[in-house]
Swiss-Prot record:
Coiled-coil regions listed in the entry: none
Lineage start: Eukaryota, Fungi, Dikarya, Ascomycota, Pezizomycotina
Leading EC class: hydrolase
Protein name per Swiss-Prot or TrEMBL: Probable exopolygalacturonase B
Subcellular location: Secreted
Organism: Aspergillus fumigatus (strain ATCC MYA-4609 / CBS 101355 / FGSC A1100 / Af293)
Length: 453
């Protein structure tokens, strides 16, 4: 009996070591060891002390620490913190399922960088049917906090080079590119202070997520190859999300600065700076046949939009096989635009559908209770004198559309033109139909250049 008892104790001890023992290069600092926390860089005035886990860093861009990172996440879960230290690089070369999280912090002060092994990632990823999206990893659970002064690096240049000339929404596209940061089935997620760099595709995608916030984040995507731009690198995309807050954030990318997508509610954005983007957009929605999509209860305030295609934009699909829905109760307030092609636009002829096709198969997405207030600055002049194009589909309702204190000019000349077609009721400012002969030339120019992503 003693032999069996000793054997059982030995087995139990071995299992305990396997689960709880440290892996090479790792250590755990207790929450009450303030001296050690300060020395490691984990002491933070704004965040409470926590049990802090440190893992080894990569010795080169080929040194994959995915297994170490996963171990560190599991060890820090349930009340701890994973510290990725300043001046160190952590290379991730394997897909990671992080949907088991509860009460965890990740302090990113170093660089977390994905490999650019295109064949591996295209064969090993998390796939989403919506617009054929894939991701390196996915984060889920509840009470997840990521903060620090470090960089989350998507290492996108190879992806940009190889995707050049292709289109993400082409039905024949098979070159899928990973999204940099994805949450799925997550509640109460916050991201603060970090930089998100060179995502291969969208920068952030939140799926079935509730109450997620970004504050003081810098999102940047650039290419060293002038013929291979960082396409489709949206700042924020959502699907089935309730509660998104973005504050004090800068976005310098090649697509939508902000783009809530189907079934997104309760969005708050304040102090957002966007350069070279496709705008602070709502949508697109209504893409899939027979599917109801909504975006509702959105407040966007104090936004600067520079050198982009669009400023404040709502977009919905049209065509023979599309869905239906609504964008309702959206306010854009105190929006500054400079050198922007379309400062204000309601686009119900999305995506890559010309005016003739759009007239034959109009959108079935309603735009209701949309306010544009205190919008000022200059267009690029590429659309002539048109500074706002508000054109509603004959199959949809556009009501409660209001413009207040609009001070927009165009280098193409004065007076600036606001176009409104198919809008129910008074919009609050003087506007002209696109059929007006004095505006037709500018409108035709605007729309000939608008039918693109």
């Amino acid at each position: 009996m003693k032999f069996f008892a000793l054997a059982a104790l030995f087995a139990s001890t071995v299992n305990s070591i396997a689960v709880d023992g440290l892996i090479p290069g790792a250590r755990v600092i207790p929450a009450n060891d303030v001296v050690a926390l300060k020395k490691a860089g984990a002491y933070h005035q704004k965040h409470h002390h926590r049990r802090t886990v440190i893992i080894r860093s990569s010795s080169s861009d080929e040194d994959d620490v995915s297994a170490d990172f996963l171990w560190g996440i599991k060890r820090a879960n349930h009340g701890g913190r994973l510290l990725l230290q300043n001046g160190k690089k952590y290379v991730i070369g394997k897909k990671l399922d992080l949907t088991f999280l509860k009460d965890i912090e990740v302090q990113l002060d170093g660089e977390l960088k994905f490999t650019n092994d295109v064949p591996y990632w295209q064969a090993n990823n998390f796939y989403y049917d919506f617009q054929k999206s894939i991701s390196f990893w996915r984060w889920g659970g509840e009470d997840i906090k990521i903060f620090g002064s470090g960089v989350l690096n998507g290492n996108g240049q190879r992806w940009y080079n190889e995707f050049a000339g292709q289109e993400i929404l082409d039905p024949n596209n098979k070159y899928y590119r990973p999204i940099l940061f994805v949450t799925e089935n997550a509640t109460r997620v916050s991201v603060e202070g970090i930089t998100q760099l060179n995502s291969p595709c969208w920068t952030n995608f939140f799926v079935r997520t509730k109450d997620i916030s970004f504050d003081n984040v810098f999102i940047h995507a650039y290419s060293t190859n002038a013929s291979a731009l960082p396409k489709n690198t949206d700042g924020f995309d959502t699907l089935n999300v309730d509660g998104l807050t973005v504050t004090n954030t800068r976005v310098d990318i090649g697509d939508d600065c902000l783009s809530p997508k189907p079934n997104t509610t309760n969005v708050f954005v304040k102090n957002l700076w966007c350069n070279g983007t496709h705008g602070a957009s709502m949508g697109s929605i209504g893409q899939y046949p027979g599917v109801l999509d909504i975006i509702e209860n959105v407040w966007i305030e104090n936004v600067t939009l520079l050198n982009g295609e669009n400023g404040a934009r709502l977009k919905a699909w049209a065509g023979p096989d599309v869905g239906y829905g609504r964008i309702n109760n959206v306010t854009y307030k105190n929006i500054h635009v400079e050198n922007t092609d379309n400062p204000i636009v309601l686009d119900q002829c999305y995506f890559n559908i010309n005016a003739t096709q759009c007239a034959a198969y109009p959108s079935r997405v309603n735009f209701t209770n949309i306010v544009f207030e205190d919008i000022y600055g200059t267009s690029s002049g590429k659309r002539g004198k048109v500074v706002a194009d508000l054109t509603c589909s004959p199959n949809a309702v556009c009501s409660g559309i209001r413009l207040k204190n609009i001070h927009l000019t165009s280098p193409a000349g004065s007076p600036p033109v606001i176009v409104c077609d198919g809008i129910q009721g008074d919009i609050g400012v003087e506007c002209q139909s696109s059929s007006n002969s004095t505006t037709r030339r500018s409108v035709d120019l605007a729309r000939s250049l608008k039918y693109r992503a």
